[in-house]
């Protein structure tokens, strides 16, 4: 596991117990943006999070991060508590199951029908297989995608 993955896992271990219903921890990212290191914690709730929610969550999470010993952060960082946005990542099977009926973007480790990217409506997620309806030029098609082939999945905005 590389240093960034280790930091993300340490943060997840201490932050997950602090984030309680109705909030849900969606994702954690740590990386450089410009010259600054940013720790982004993506949180959501059913009706969406507000600016006040992010402020309250920051006050809860920041002191907890200071308890991690030894300090895993090699340099100073900015803490960002944010919404996952319209293109929310689908990082778990539960998240994918919750996206049935929605328009999603899926990247694959290995091509299916000579395609490694599909964007369309998730019709079903059963027995570790996604069933998606997508447009191939002007025709609607359906594809079955084994979950094990999914490298990245997220909600998508249909234009």
From Swiss-Prot:
Compartments, as annotated in UniProt: Cytoplasm
According to its UniProt record, where is this protein mainly located? cytoplasm
What's the protein called, per UniProt? Ribosome maturation factor RimP
Answer whether the UniProt record assigns the keyword Phosphoprotein to this protein.
no
**Which UniProt key words apply to this protein?**
Cytoplasm, Ribosome biogenesis
Provide GO CC annotations from the record.
cytosol
Its BP terms in the Gene Ontology are: ribosomal small subunit assembly; translation
Write down the Pfam families for this protein, in alphabetical order. Answer: DUF150_C (PF17384), RimP_N (PF02576)
Function of this protein? Answer: Required for maturation of 30S ribosomal subunits.
Which family does this protein fall into? Belongs to the RimP family.
SUPFAM superfamilies attached to this UniProt entry: YhbC-like, C-terminal domain, YhbC-like, N-terminal domain
Is Cytoplasm among this UniProt entry's keywords?
yes
């Amino acid at each position: 596991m590389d240093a960034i993955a280790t930091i993300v896992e340490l943060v997840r271990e201490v932050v997950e117990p602090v984030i309680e219903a109705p909030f849900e921890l969606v994702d954690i990212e740590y990386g450089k943006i410009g010259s600054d290191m940013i720790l982004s914690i993506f949180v959501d709730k059913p009706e969406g999070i507000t600016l006040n929610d992010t402020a309250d969550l920051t006050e809860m999470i920041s002191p907890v991060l200071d308890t991690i010993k030894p300090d895993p952060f090699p340099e100073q960082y900015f803490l960002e508590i944010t919404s996952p946005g319209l293109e929310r990542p689908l990082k778990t099977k539960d998240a994918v199951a919750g996206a049935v009926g929605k328009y999603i973007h899926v990247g694959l480790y290995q091509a299916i029908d000579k395609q490694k990217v599909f964007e369309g409506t998730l019709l079903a997620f059963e027995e570790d297989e996604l069933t998606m309806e997508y447009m191939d030029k002007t025709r609607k098609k359906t594809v079955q995608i084994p979950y094990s082939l999914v490298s990245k999945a997220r909600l998508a905005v249909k234009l």
